Amino acid sequence: MSPRDVVAGVGALAVGLVLAGCAASRIEHGTFHSAKGYQVTLPGDGWRVETGGDADLALRRDAPPGGMLADATCEGRSLQYPLPILARHLTFGFTDRTTVESATEIVNGRPAERALVRGTVDGREVSAEAVVVKGARCIHDFLYVAPSSDFDAGRRDFRAFVESLSGDSR
């Protein structure tokens, strides 16, 4: 199994944890506009939109390999859970899971939880950075996953992606 297959498997796992995106979402001038009312700026340098997933937005890069997603949950019980628990849920499915770092922070004026996790998926060592941001009406999930050997190559893009969050979700 190639690192790309590992990233695809982890991406599918993460996507399965989030709600379905809406068809009215669009991309204009490098910005993703979610039908749920928020926006994020797309990273450059080889990242492409993956269609057909359940997240509002899923991105993949072949070289170096990696995947990231953005999603918002605007109803249901998950809105009541503490941010650290929600961040942990984004990396369910990892075996030999180790939390390397976790921190409570602010993303564009909103409370957030960030966790860096290493583990094994389908026999391959991967790393993930999960960020959960609490908006006025929604929880925003961001996830970046890559083979551990390639993880640092996409981390700056992921952080810029998360920090670009704007708008007031419905």
Role assignments for model-derived ranges:
Residues 40, 84, 88, 92, ...:
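Solvent-exposed, polar/charged alpha-helical surfaces in well-ordered, non-transmembrane soluble domains
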Residues 49-141, 146:
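Conserved polar/disulfide-associated segments of primarily extracytoplasmic proteins
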Residues 18-21:
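C-terminal motif of bacterial Sec signal peptides marking the signal peptidase cleavage site
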Residues 23-25:
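Bacterial signal peptide processing site
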